[in-house]
Amino acid sequence: MVNMEQQRIEVVGKLGSTYGIRGWLRIYSSTEYAESIFDYQPWFLKIKGQWQPTELESWRYHNNDLIVKLKHVDDRETAQTLANIEIGVDLAVFPELEEGDYYWHDLIGCNVVNLENYAMGTVTEMMETGSNDVLVVRAKSKDAFGKQERLIPFLYEQVVKRVDLNTKTIVVDWDAGF
């Protein structure tokens, strides 16, 4: 039996619409490379607000889509009940990263300050732009520069000077007026 209390589940994708009549579903991966979602097992599905373990039976490409077959999902009707359900994995299965590399879930919620020690806000999400990732920083309600949100490129050493996950702080070389 899986003890959900001791696990931290991270969303890595989402089940999409059904495919065919034998229980296959399209899948949307939020991993860096779409196929990497299959490297992280076991999967958990968020059903009615609760993470439920599931087993992947098979997967393949169909045109440009990834499709999956889950164990005990053998017909279209059962598959339809899982459409748009989030897929999560236990953070313990993620590999350790090299220094300067971070998982997005570790950065979200961090407070961002610049070199002048100005509190720029809190990371609420991350964006992928192709050339580099971007921190989406929600400013405090009384921001001196009138900003509600800042987009700060996550360029380690160039813009991002330090990340301290223990204190949930990111220090950036970034003008607070931007």
Swiss-Prot record:
GO biological process, one term: rRNA processing
Pfam short name (any one): RimM
Main subcellular location of this protein, as a coarse class: cytoplasm
Keywords carried by this UniProt record: Chaperone, Cytoplasm, Ribosome biogenesis, rRNA processing
Cellular compartment(s): Cytoplasm
GO molecular function, one term: ribosome binding
One GO cellular component, as annotated: cytoplasm
Keyword Chaperone: yes
Domain PRC barrel positions: 99-178
InterPro entries: PRC_barrel-like_sf, PRC_RimM, RimM, RimM_N, RimM_N_sf, Transl_B-barrel_sf
Role summary: An accessory protein needed during the final step in the assembly of 30S ribosomal subunit, possibly for assembly of the head region. Essential for efficient processing of 16S rRNA. May be needed both before and after RbfA during the maturation of 16S rRNA. It has affinity for free ribosomal 30S subunits but not for 70S ribosomes.
NCBIfam families recorded: 16S_RimM
Subunit comment: Binds ribosomal protein uS19.
Entry's free-text remark on domains: The PRC barrel domain binds ribosomal protein uS19.
Family: Belongs to the RimM family.
Protein name (database record): Ribosome maturation factor RimM
